[in-house]
Amino acid sequence: FDYRCGYCRRSAPDLFAVRDESQAVKIIYKEFPILGDASRVAAVAALAAREQDLYEPFHEALMTQDIDFSQPSIMTLATEVGLDTDQLLDDMADPEIQEYLDRTYELARALGVNGTPAFIIDGVLYPGALSRADLEQLIAMSGG
């Protein structure tokens, strides 16, 4: 997903609802910032938030809040979810984050993902936005 992708943002609340309703569903988020520098800054900030154990709330805020995705607005949102922004900025400089994103790009290429959003359910790629009903149906069909 890309934090600035309108279709990703539209699918996010449905994805969160499905996640919250089923203990059997495991969601692995893969940041795939393809819509410019602001997308990359948001992805790096979200990944850096893992160091403060606040990835999930920050990820949800980035996906649902109406911000312009400038670094100042991302930092304001980070503060709102309880992140220490000085530490966040330090953690954003960690080269492991860029290595992680590089591996994600490689994985996307290998899987044939060339846009956002994309979902992989039980090993099958579903490109494009999915509604809650679509997600529930595909998960049920996979035995989940």
Regions found by a protein language model. Name each.
Residues F1-T79, R109-N114:
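Structural alpha/beta surface segment adjacent to cysteine/selenocysteine redox centers
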Residues Y7, P13-F16, M75-G144:
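C-terminal cap of thioredoxin/glutaredoxin-like
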